[in-house]
Regions:
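Hydrophobic alpha-helical membrane segments
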Residues: 1-197
Length: 197
């Protein structure tokens, strides 16, 4: 499903990943204030990249302007993304495994923020937790299916990540779409992922 959505859009998707990675990497490299810049600018851009790929999953063309959509509703997006990060870190302080589990519980938050503009902060995070109840392992296995490609990307000096990153993001968007479609009934997920590039 993700590969089909990317048909004819691979180059543009790679450019979107490059822009996102350049912003994230560039901000973190700024001396002294890099951490703060990554926080206040990086979180909305990370949201924007996720939403760009959600659009591709829904058959839309890639619009680089959407990368910066998080700044149009900055307070809601930033605070929610920050809370998500803080909660994950706090759980990770207890043990690594609880932190990983919680990160999967919160994985649908960005999509929910996009589709439900009236929802914010803990409400969006809690809805993600409800959607992921019983589905965290499925998403983990989906992510795990890309490990081989991630290892191969090491031998391309990271260039392959420009193609893998959108593929993973769109696969997660497809996972969300399937979950959302089943909200009225079973929460079983049936997302077929082919990691052949």
């Amino acid at each position: 499903q993700a590969r089909e959505a990317l048909r004819g859009k691979w180059p543009m998707a790679a450019v979107a990943a490059l822009i996102y990675s350049a912003i994230a990497g560039g901000l973190s490299a700024i001396p002294v204030i890099g951490g703060l810049c990554s926080l206040f600018v990086g979180l909305p851009v990370a949201y924007g990249f996720t939403i760009v790929m959600l659009g591709v999953c829904r058959g839309k063309d890639i619009d680089f302007g959407v990368l910066f959509e998080g700044f149009q509703d900055y307070g809601r997006i930033f605070v929610t993304m920050l809370l998500q990060a803080v909660y994950t870190i706090l759980w990770s302080l207890l043990l690594v495994i609880p932190g990983i589990i919680k990160s999967y519980s919160y994985a649908m938050t960005s999509f929910i923020l996009k589709d439900e503009p009236e929802m914010k902060n803990n409400a969006a995070i809690e809805k993600s937790m409800a959607m992921m109840e019983g589905n965290k392992m499925k998403l983990f296995m989906l992510d795990l299916s890309f490990i081989g490609w991630a290892i191969l990307c090491i031998f391309t000096l990271g260039i392959g990540l420009l193609f893998l990153q959108p593929y993973v993001a769109i696969s997660r968007a497809a996972f969300y779409e399937d979950l959302k479609a089943q909200q009225g009934g079973s929460v079983e997920v049936n997302v077929e992922v082919n990691v052949e590039i």
